[in-house]
UniProtKB/Swiss-Prot annotation:
Glycans are attached at residues 214, 288, 291, 297, 303, 315, 321, 333, 362, 1191, 1205. Changing residue 1306 to V: In MYOSCN4A and PMC. Residues 151-157, 211-216, 273-391, 417-423, 598-608, 663-664, 718-746, 768-778, 1051-1063, 1116-1123, 1180-1230, 1253-1269, 1373-1383, 1433-1445, 1500-1521, 1545-1574 are extracellular. GO terms for cellular component: plasma membrane; voltage-gated sodium channel complex. One of its GO terms (biological process) is regulation of skeletal muscle contraction by action potential. It comes from the Eukaryota. PANTHER family: SODIUM CHANNEL PROTEIN TYPE 4 SUBUNIT ALPHA (PTHR10037:SF223), VOLTAGE-GATED CATION CHANNEL CALCIUM AND SODIUM (PTHR10037). The sequence contains 4 internal repeats, each with 5 hydrophobic segments (S1, S2, S3, S5, S6) and one positively charged segment (S4). Segments S4 are probably the voltage-sensors and are characterized by a series of positively charged amino acids at every third position. The gene is SCN4A. Residues 39-60, 876-885 have a biased composition (Basic and acidic residues). InterPro entries: Ion_trans_dom, Na_channel_a4su_mammal, Na_channel_asu, Na_chnl_inactivation_gate, Na_trans_assoc_dom, VGCC_Ca_Na, Volt_channel_dom_sf. This is Sodium channel protein type 4 subunit alpha. Residues 39-63, 493-530, 863-885, 930-992, 1778-1836 are annotated as: Disordered. The chain crosses the membrane at residues 132-150, 158-178, 193-210, 217-233, 253-272, 424-444, 579-597, 609-628, 643-662, 665-682, 699-717, 779-797, 1033-1050, 1064-1082, 1097-1115, 1124-1142, 1160-1179, 1270-1291, 1355-1372, 1384-1402, 1415-1432, 1446-1462, 1482-1499, 1575-1597.
């Protein structure tokens, strides 16, 4: 066994690789026997074995570690002994292939026939491990995949199929021969990936030989072959591992999701059952027998057409189905069939372009029908009948769709139209709780699983690196020793013959023949072997072979002659100058601008300018590259990534110039756009984000591959399963019976559908699929893609991005404070400007300053912009980052030097560091005159001397705690509390009105407050200060703000009709304005201008009041109708913003957001740059190509055969019915390109853009259906990079930023107010409950029996089962159920109500008043009461109030019962606990979101109230009233449907809309929108709500999920303590807090894991050393501490935990009994053992004495003489003489007993009386307690 162990300790090269022979096998068997014997011995001696694990670097599939060197060719491909010590006694061997990959095999005979030494098996192994074999299999799989993508395979493909099956069978055969089938480890079926192969092959044979009916379904199994690629590509297995891990972890979330969705679905079922079938049906004409007359303004013609009322109120035409035929099935001459009439679709009201009839409702706030139509429940549900709440399953699907937010705006609008706007609440709850919370929980879980997986791999890599370092150290030491030995030998003059490292088993000679060619191989000397080994190791870390470096030095470094070198140096000086960099950067920006200026239509002149510009820029960049090549030599030039990047782009630009006129290569122009990325060189954020994307691309590369495989598999599955159906049943989904755009008939379209599902849009394509191919199959496939692809893989994608975002990556972006060339150049320019300024000022003042003086004065005034040079002159080691306080001081100095109004820029900070950074050593001459810096004002000195925690940054914007304008918590910033108390006994005082600089400039501002007017003024200011500081004043102002905001909500389109309200509002507006002016003036007087205008919140108030003042003045002057004034009035919508500073919750969030704004803006800019590239590319590809010719009457496009281009269309225009029209959102310029990209990235409105792109031909040509099909790929690529990447970067940046802010606050939550933090901590402490008194068992016998029943666990379980059954009965309800079913369900419900009422009554009976002390019981009670009330009321409501809504809401109470299930499930409780912990923060963000919605809806009402009703805007969803606006904005919060709302607003004039249209009831004219305002409105709202607020929501959930899981994954959670206390209650019913020592064993055995110590536990309890009080009692806390210590182990944190537990307990139990422990369990045991020892010793002593006495008595009785008796008196003597002696005590004649004793030859010799049971002392050990010898010895 020595050999392998030595090898693994110091594996010096390939000698460790020994062939596997029969001897090796025998040795293994021998070792296995020895090991078994050793284990048996250890088991008997109870020695615990440390668990052994296989070495991770020697796992099968990994490459042979470098430390083994290169294996010699003779060991490749043959069985070798296993290197891993773990397998030293297991029958395995390894084989290496040429790539040094390890394959591990079982050494048992394969298939019971082939031993490892058989020729067949060795041959199979050689084939299996060969690289060509796996390559061949890989190629086969890929070819097979190509064949699978054929939609109509040719006849010969069958033979190809057989070939593939044959190859796969051959592969499996080889594997089985080489590995064995399934008996041992490392055999064929022990690898789960092989199960895949096996099942695929079996399926192939099954489908071939057995007729199984639906073949296509089974043939789809072949697709799984694509998964085999995963086994061949190494990185993929890790990702798949992470995927599988995350799926395991998702189980709890999945259960919670399904549970929540079920509850919501039940709610939906109760509320909206049957609602979506309510349609507008034309009211039928009255019939009589002879003639049919229609009593109305219109006439009914027997056989002809009915001219219906086509106009509905609104400005749009709604097309009804106009032709009625009296011979329809429902009308005969004598009867009228009502059912047939209302189910005839001809009588429904359809909107133009809609497949479904218009829905309506009967409640007041639901949708209404046009005149002549009635709302009747009939026909099928919308969307082929698949969108409904009629049964539980459809409701569940609808809610799942709502949760994944796919096309949910449609569901939202349908539901609100049918049921009423009040039900928006239902959607709000589900979107926020269901959608945001659950979906992000999935993200949180996946992210966590990935992070864990990642940590594991990182740890492994680190280990390897360390191992490598150790090996190098060993080699070096070894080499040193050898050299020493050599030196010693040389001194001795002797030569060592042979190998100095001879005794070693694995000597270090490595095969270096593959290194440098021609190097002789000297393996004879160990010395050279080791140095070779070191070289090899070093080389392994180098990228290229050595000859490559030699060659590169010769060819790529150009140093030929001296003049050339001189020239080179000059060029180097020029090219490397910072100004050149600045110039190049400006050129890049200009070039980008030039490219962005392209548009359609463009004049020829403009086009020429752009072309010339492009040539110039190409020239500049080419020149830069050539000069750099000369200056740096290619060798140096190509060492830098940026230069390589430059050279590629320049080359592409030149190629593009050459190919400029070739058709179809316009895309090459887009490569020029990559120049934009050169900005990253000097733009840290862009640089960092590119790095982050780079970092994640490695892992993402693998993930993308997995995603691609998944997409491929599902695309093929879809095509195989549904392709035919799409072709055959196409008429069900398309009126013209042509395949729609989204189908699965061929692979490309199938791929697009799967990709669309990954983007989160699955429901619409699924409806089509269900219509053509049946529901079950489509649901299965689509939901699988959705769950696997979208929820898991895409979340893993996000998790990867988030993981590459760590604070380090952000921090590192500054490159350790070095300045880049750009900053140096700008610094120089600033310096130059400053120099010129100072020189001119000197001239003006008549002083000519020397340059030195100028420099000096600059140094004082603005930090001598020589930061760059300063940095260079400082010694390297002193370029440290300045500490934070210095930066804070810098801020103050900046503010007082009048340099900065706002946070100093990095540059200014650099200059400042230069001035007062103690870490820079620069000699500065002494200043000649005093400067600001030397005489800090009073305020500054204060600030410097303030303690750390009271320092406030100078910019109040970021100031989370104090805001003057919310005076509730105003504190004057400067003074220390102590000073304040001394100076100012009456409390706080106002500050100076003006800053000192102002007073110095204008001395008249100085007021003496000690006398005269000044004193009065001071008194007035103090009075104002008191008023303003008063709480009531603040409350009053808040109330006014709320009222004035509320007043804005009334100004809708009906305001002109409501005269009274209008008048009231006008007056109110004036009153509010006066009040706010008054408040502002008071604050000016109280605080002074200095304080007021240095506070950001006050500025906000000031600006908002200004708006009111201006509109007030305009009203007085009669200019209120002026355009600018009107638009100013819309700014009143900002009034609610004033509430921000007053509500602490919102202010906290806003402060957090403001802190994040810089980084958010940075990322936004980077994203815009990213998108700019796609936008310009879009302009290149699509500008002017989206126009089409349309027939305006039928809204149909002309076919390409009728109209081919713009001129043909214009020739038809004289008919008046034709227009040459553009798609509203297009790529005609970069701005519109951005809008298009935003719609694509949010997946809203992207279909129209994509269709237009795919149909586009050339500029001014009529589009043709899918003529440009592969343009889909532009969108696919953009979605991957522009949407997945950039939008997720936002989440990353925001989360990262909040984490950094938290760090600064010392880990406190940044989204919660102090009050809410208390709630949060209370939630966390839920577990620290005191032991409650258990509810005492009642005395009454019957009550007692009930009590026993109710407290049994079985009772609880039964109730849970009943709740589940009740849930099932609720799910069974459907719309239109038969009367029988209604009655049955009613009765079942009655039974359940009786059961639950019974349970409630039983519990009340048993638990008496204690019933209401448990929260869940109260909940149960409420539910029962509501159920009973519901039963009673349902009849009343149906009889007297015909309000189905009320009735339905009451029925919801039953669903409450389902929630009781939560009690039982621990995993779900954790997740809900995370939600509960997030609530306060989420509430704050919700408030902020509501504020934003409020402001935007007011703004929307004033701008878009009258736009034309089309696409997304109709009679219910519009901006006419406040309620409608809020509904629309809620919809857009998730970015749903914003394209529909934007469309009508983009109508800017006729013929799209009519600017002179009269709007009845108001004086406003026209129904046109304002495109620019509309675009700004929607884009800003989407960015604010979707990107910021929603992402903050995500950040908080991720955070709290981590906290909650940490709580639950810790070995001990609050639940465990709760369980401890629950068990305690049973053992300590009187809550004395003590338990008898005798019951301790039972108590710890009754606990649940992890605290439980199972019986036999006596010894364990003794070793716990628990303190005991008199009466042998133990306190509950002591037991808890001991058990906790047992679980967590003894650590430093333990004491802290103990202290907190004690504090919690003391707080919870003020009555804690004071106790003084007198002993401990361990001491008690010691005492017992000692007592037993003493007893035994004493017994022995007694025994000896009785022996002596006995022998004396014996002798005495025999010979009568002898010495004195040893025991003359005492117990022993008396007893013995009583029993054996004479009456007188020393009689010489023996008694008969004694004779008997003597006669008995037994050994007892009269010792019987001294048995322990007879002696009163010492006491016997307690019965039943046997003391084990081992314990006795150890304890004493």
């Amino acid at each position: 066994m020595a050999r392998p162990s030595l090898c693994t300790l110091v594996p010096l090269g390939p000698e460790c690789l020994r062939p596997f022979t029969r001897e090796s096998l025998a040795a293994i068997e021998q070792r296995a026997v020895e090991e078994e014997a050793r284990l048996q011995r250890n088991k008997q001696m109870e020695i615990e074995e440390p668990e052994r694990k296989p070495r991770s670097d020697l796992e099968a599939g990994k490459n042979l570690p470098m430390i083994y060197g290169d294996p010699p060719p003779e060991v490749i491909g043959i069985p070798l002994e296993d290197l891993d010590p773990y397998y030293s006694n297991k029958k395995t061997f390894i084989v290496l292939n040429k790539g040094k990959a390890i394959f591990r095999f079982s050494a048992t005979p394969a298939l019971y026939l082939l031993s490892p030494f058989s020729v067949v098996r060795r041959g199979a192994i050689k084939v299996l491990i060969h690289a060509l074999f796996s390559m061949f299999i890989m190629i086969t799989i890929l070819t097979n995949c190509v064949f699978m993508t054929m939609s109509d395979p040719p006849p010969w493909s069958k033979n190809v199929e057989y070939t593939f099956t044959g190859i796969y069978t051959f592969e499996s055969l080889i594997k089985i021969l080489a590995r064995g089938f399934c008996v041992d480890d490392f055999t064929f079926l022990r690898d789960p990936w092989n199960w895949l192969d096996f099942s695929v092959i079996m399926m192939a044979y099954l489908t071939e030989f057995v007729d199984l009916g639906n073949i296509s379904a089974l043939r789809t199994f072949r697709v799984l072959r694509a998964l085999k690629t995963i086994t061949v590509i190494p990185g993929l297995k890790t990702i798949v591992g992470a995927l599988i891990q995350s799926v395991k972890k998702l189980s709890d979330v999945m259960i919670l999701t399904v549970f929540c969705l079920s509850v919501f679905a039940l709610v939906g079922l109760q509320l909206f059952m049957g609602n979506l079938r309510q349609k507008c049906v034309r009211w039928p004409p009255p019939f009589n027998d002879t003639n049919t007359t229609w009593y109305s303004n219109d006439t009914w013609y027997g056989n002809d057409t009915w001219y219906g009322n086509e106009m509905w109120y609104g400005n749009d035409s709604w097309y009804a189905n106009d032709t009625w035929n009296s011979h329809a099935s429902w009308a005969t001459n004598d009867t009228f069939d009502w059912d047939a009439y209302i189910s005839d679709e001809g009588n429904f009201y359809f909107l133009e372009g809609s497949n479904d009839a218009l829905l309506c409702g009967n409640s007041s706030d639901a949708g209404h029908c046009p005149e002549g139509y009635e709302c009747i429940k009939t026909g099928r549900n919308p969307n082929y009948g698949y969108t409904s709440y009629d049964t539980f399953s459809w409701a569940f699907l609808a809610l799942f769709r709502l949760m994944t937010q796919d096309y949910w705006e449609n569901l939202f609008q349908l539901t609100l139209r049918a049921a009423g706007k009040t039900y928006m609440i239902f959607f709000v709850v589900i979107i926020f709780l269901g959608s945001f919370y659950l979906i992000n929980l999935i993200l949180a879980v996946v992210a966590m699983a990935y992070a864990e997986q990642n940590e594991a791999t990182l740890a492994e890599d680190k280990e390897k690196e360390e191992e490598f370092q150790q090996m190098l150290e060993k080699f070096k030491k070894h080499q040193e020793e050898l050299e020493k030995a050599k030196a010693a030998q040389a001194l001795e003059g002797g030569e060592a013959d042979g190998d100095p490292a001879h005794g070693k088993d694995c000597n270090g000679s490595l095969d270096t023949s593959q290194g440098e060619k021609g190097a002789p191989r000297q393996s004879s000397s160990g010395d050279s072997g080791i140095s070779d080994a070191m070289e090899e190791l070093e080389e392994a870390h180098q990228k290229c072979p050595p000859w490559w470096y030699k060659c590169a030095h010769k060819v790529l470094i150009w140093n030929c002659c001296a003049p050339w070198l001189k020239f080179k140096n000059i060029i180097h000086l020029i090219v490397m100058d910072p100004f050149v960099d600045l110039g190049i950067t400006i050129c890049i920006v200009l070039n980008t601008l030039f490219m962005a200026m392209e548009h359609y239509p463009m004049t020829e002149h403009f086009d020429n300018v752009l072309t010339v510009g492009n040539l110039v820029f190409t020239g500049i960049f080419t020149a830069e590259m050539v000069l750099k090549l000369i200056a740096m030599d290619p060798y140096e030039y190509f060492q830098q990534g940026w230069n390589i990047f430059d050279s590629i782009i320049v080359t592409l630009s030149l190629v593009e110039l050459g190919l400029a006129n070739v058709q179809g290569l316009s895309v090459l122009r887009s490569f020029r756009l990559l120049r934009v990325f050169k900005l990253a060189k000097s733009w840290p954020t862009l640089n960092m984000l590119i790095k982050i994307i780079g970092n994640s691309v490695g892992a993402l590369g693998n993930l993308t591959l997995v995603l691609a495989i998944i997409v491929f598999i599902f695309a093929v599955v879809g095509m195989q399963l549904f392709g035919k159906s799409y072709k055959e049943c196409v008429c069900k989904i398309a009126l013209d019976c042509n395949l729609p755009r989204w189908h699965m008939h061929d692979f490309f379209h199938s791929f697009l559908i799967v990709f669309r599902i990954l983007c989160g849009e699955w429901i619409e394509t699924m409806w089509d699929c269900m219509e053509v191919a049946g529901q079950a199959m489509c649901l299965t496939v689509f939901l699988m893609v959705m769950v696997i692809g979208n929820l898991v893989v895409l979340n893993l994608f996000l998790a990867l991005l988030l993981s590459s975002f760590s604070a380090d990556s952000l921090a590192a972006s500054d490159e350790d404070g070095e300045m880049n060339n750009l900053q140096i150049a700008i610094g120089r320019i600033k310096l130059g400007i400053g120099f010129a300024k100072a020189f001119l000022l000197g001239l003006l003042h008549g002083k000519i300053l020397s340059p030195k003086d100028i420099m000096l004065s600059l140094g004082e005034a603005d930090g001598a912009g020589e930061a760059g040079e300063a940095g260079e002159t400082a010694p390297e080691d002193e370029k440290k980052e300045p500490p934070e306080e210095d930066l804070k001081k810098d801020n103050h100095i900046l503010n007082h030097m009048g340099l900065a109004d706002g946070p100093p820029s990095s540059l200014e900070l650099d200059h400042l560091n230069f001035i007062n950074n103690p870490y820079l050593t620069i000699q500065v001459p002494i200043a000649s005159e005093e400067s600001d810096l030397e005489m800090p004002t009073e305020e500054e000195t204060d600030t410097f001397s303030e303690p750390e925690d009271s320092k406030k940054p100078p910019q109040p914007l970021y100031d989370g705690n104090s805001s003057v304008c919310s005076t509730a918590d105003y504190k004057p910033p400067e003074e220390d509390p102590e000073e304040q108390a001394e100076e100012n006994p009456e409390g706080e005082q106002p500050e100076e009105c003006f800053t000192e600089a102002c007073v110095q400039r204008w001395p008249c501002l100085y007021v003496d407050i000690s006398q005269g007017r000044g004193k009065k003024w001071w008194t007035l200011r103090r009075a104002c200060f008191k008023i303003v500081e008063h709480n009531w004043f603040e409350t009053f102002i808040v109330f006014m703000i709320l009222l004035s905001s509320g007043a804005l909500a009334f100004e809708d389109i009906y305001i002109e009709q409501r005269r009274v309200i209008r008048t009231i509002l006008e007056y109110a507006d004036k009153v509010f304005t006066y009040i706010f002016i008054m408040e502002m003036l008071l604050k000016w007087v109280a605080y002074g201008f200095k304080v007021y205008f240095t506070n950001a919140w006050c500025w906000l108030d000031f600006l908002i009041v200004d708006v009111s003042i201006i509109s007030l003045v305009a009203n007085w002057l009669g200019y209120s109708e002026l355009g600018p004034i009107k638009s100013l009035r819309t700014l009143r919508a900002l009034r609610p913003l004033r509430a921000l500073s007053r509500f602490e919750g919102m202010r906290v969030v806003v402060n957090a957001l403001l802190g994040a704004i810089p980084s958010i803006m940075n990322v936004l800019l980077v994203c815009l740059i990213f998108w700019l590239i796609f936008s310009i590319m879009g302009v290149n590809l699509f500008a002017g190509k989206f126009y089409y010719c349309i027939n305006t009457t039928t809204s149909e496009r002309f076919d390409i055969s009728e109209v081919n281009n713009k001129s043909e269309c214009e020739s038809l225009m004289h008919t008046g019915q034709v227009r040459w029209l553009n798609v509203k959102v297009n790529y005609d310029n970069v701005g519109l390109g951005y809008l298009s990209l935003l719609q694509v990235a949010t997946f809203k409105g992207w279909m129209d853009i994509m269709y237009a792109a795919v149909d586009s031909r050339e500029k001014e040509e009529q589009p043709q259906y899918e003529v440009n099909l592969y343009m889909y790929l532009y969108f696919v690529i953009f979605i991957i990079f522009g949407s997945f990447f950039t939008l997720n970067l936002f989440i990353g940046v925001i989360i990262d930023n909040f984490n950094q802010q938290k760090k600064k606050l010392g880990g406190k939550d940044i989204f919660m107010t102090e009050e809410q933090k208390k709630y949060y901590n209370a939630m966390k402490k839920l577990g620290s409950k005191k032991p409650q008194k258990p509810i005492p068992r009642p005395q009454n016998k019957i009550q007692g029996m009930v009590y026993d029943l109710v407290t049994k666990q079985a009772f609880d379980i039964t109730i849970m089962i009943l709740i589940c059954l009740n849930m099932v009965t609720m799910m069974v309800e459907t719309d239109n159920q038969s009367q029988l079913k209604v009655d049955i369900l009613y009765n079942i419900n009655m039974i359940f109500i009786i059961i639950f009422t019974g349970e409630c009554v039983l519990k009340m009976l048993a638990l008496r008043q204690y019933y209401f002390t448990v929260g869940w019981n109260i909940f149960d009670f409420v539910v029962v009461i509501l159920s009973i009330v519901g039963l009673a009321l349902s009849d009343l409501i149906q009889k007297y109030f015909v309000s189905p809504t009320l009735f339905r809401v009451i029925r919801l109470a039953r669903i409450g019962r389902v929630l009781r299930l939560i009690r039982g499930a621990k995993g779900i409780r954790t997740l809900l606990f995370a939600l509960m912990m997030s609530l306060p923060a989420l509430f704050n963000i919700g408030l902020l979101l509501f504020l934003v919605m409020f402001i935007y809806s007011i703004f929307g009402m004033s701008n878009f109230a009258y736009v034309k009703k089309e696409s997304g805007i109709d009679d219910m969803f519009n901006f006419e009233t406040f309620g409608n606006s809020i509904i629309c904005l809620f919809e857009i919060t998730t970015s749903a449907g914003w394209d529909g709302l934007l469309n009508p607003i983009l109508n800017s004039g006729p013929p799209d809309c009519d600017p002179n249209l009269e709007n009845p009831g108001t004086s406003v004219k026209g129904d046109c929108g304002n495109p620019s305002i509309g675009i700004c409105f929607f884009c800003s709202y989407i960015i604010i709500s979707f990107l910021i607020v929603v992402n903050m929501y995500i950040a908080i959930i991720l955070e709290n999920f981590n906290v909650a899981t940490e709580e639950s994954s810790e070995p001990l959670g609050e639940d465990d303590f709760e369980m401890f206390y629950e068990t305690w209650e049973k053992f300590d019913p009187d809550a004395t807090q003590f338990i008898a020592y005798s019951r301790l064993s039972d108590f710890v055995d009754t606990l649940q894991e992890p605290l439980r110590i199972a019986k036999p536990n006596k010894i364990k309890l003794i070793t716990l050393d628990l303190p005991m009080v008199p009466g042998d009692k133990i306190h509950c806390l002591d037991i808890l501490f001991a058990l906790t210590k047992e679980v967590l182990g003894d650590s430093g944190e333990m004491d802290a935990l103990k202290q907190t537990m004690e504090e919690k307990f003391m707080a919870a139990n003020p009555s804690k009994v004071s106790y003084e422990p007198i002993t401990t369990t361990l001491k008690r045991k010691h005492e017992e053992v000692c007592a037993i020892k003493i007893q035994r010793a004493y017994r022995r002593h007694l025994l000896q004495r009785s022996m002596k006495q006995a022998s004396y008595m014996y002798r005495h009785s025999h010979d009568g003489s002898g010495d004195d008796a040893p025991e003359k008196e005492g117990l022993l003597a008396n007893t013995m003489s009583k029993m054996y002696g004479h009456e007188n005590g020393n009689s010489s004649s023996p008694s008969p007993e004694e004779k008997g004793e003597a006669g008995d030859a037994g050994p007892t010799m009269g010792l019987m009386p001294i048995s322990p049971s007879d002696t009163a002392w010492p006491p016997a050990p307690p019965p039943g307690q046997t003391v084990r010898p081992g314990v006795k010895e150890s304890l004493v």
